[in-house]
A protein has these predicted regions:
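Hydrophobic alpha-helical core bundles mediating ligand binding, dimerization, or RNAP-core interactions
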Residues: 21-43, 118-136, 141-155, 159
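N-terminal leader segment of winged-helix/HTH proteins
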Residues: 1-46, 93
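Charged, amphipathic alpha-helical coiled-coil/dimerization segments
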Residues: 2-8, 87-149
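N-terminal helix-turn-helix DNA-binding core of bacterial DNA-binding proteins
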Residues: 33-80
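Amphipathic alpha-helical interaction surfaces
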Residues: 34, 58, 65, 87, ...
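Short acidic DE-rich linear segments
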Residues: 161-163
Length: 163
């Protein structure tokens, strides 16, 4: 049995049976591989490298972004963002505009072509997620979504402990 410190439980040490730990590791690995394969398919389908595709998707949440903001959201250095942004500009998916409040700052925004591409990507993702949910009975969906929320919260809590 593995003893795992748990700062959220009443008992400071939680017993995690080895079989559960192994099953969890195996499932996480398989989910990660499945997501990686979908990302590769998506990159091929939309003819964008992974980093450019992930960057483009950030514009779904924001009308304007800065290179610094992209670097923070993508967890990469600003010089890497410059290369990604240059690729998206070359493909006419985003454009640079001067910040009206600070001419030293360049804002990045989607072009009409970029907006259309992002809509295609989002429609593709919506369809993929719909197809996944269709594989799960309506009764099980609620439990799956609840458990995914719990998993996400647990993973974020552990991530915070690592920082």
């Amino acid at each position: 049995m593995n003893k795992v410190a748990n700062s959220y439980a009443m008992d400071p040490v939680v017993d995690v049976p080895e079989y559960q730990l192994q099953q969890f590791q195996s499932l996480i690995l398989k989910l990660f591989q499945c997501c990686q394969e979908r990302m590769q398919y998506q990159c091929d389908r939309f003819q964008l490298p992974d980093a450019e595709l992930r960057c483009l998707m950030l514009f779904g949440e924001e009308r304007y972004l800065t290179a610094k903001g992209i670097a923070l959201k993508m967890n990469v250095v600003k010089s890497r963002v410059s290369k990604i942004v240059d690729g998206l500009i070359k493909k006419k998916l985003i454009q640079r505009i001067k910040d009206p409040e600070d001419s030293r700052v360049s804002l990045l925004s989607l072009t009409p072509v970029g907006s259309e591409k992002l809509n295609e990507i989002n429609e593709f993702l919506k369809d993929v997620h719909y197809q996944v949910l269709c594989q799960i009975t309506p009764e099980q969906r609620k439990a799956v979504l609840t458990n995914l929320d719990i998993l996400k919260a647990s993973m974020e809590a552990v991530k915070e402990m690592m920082v």
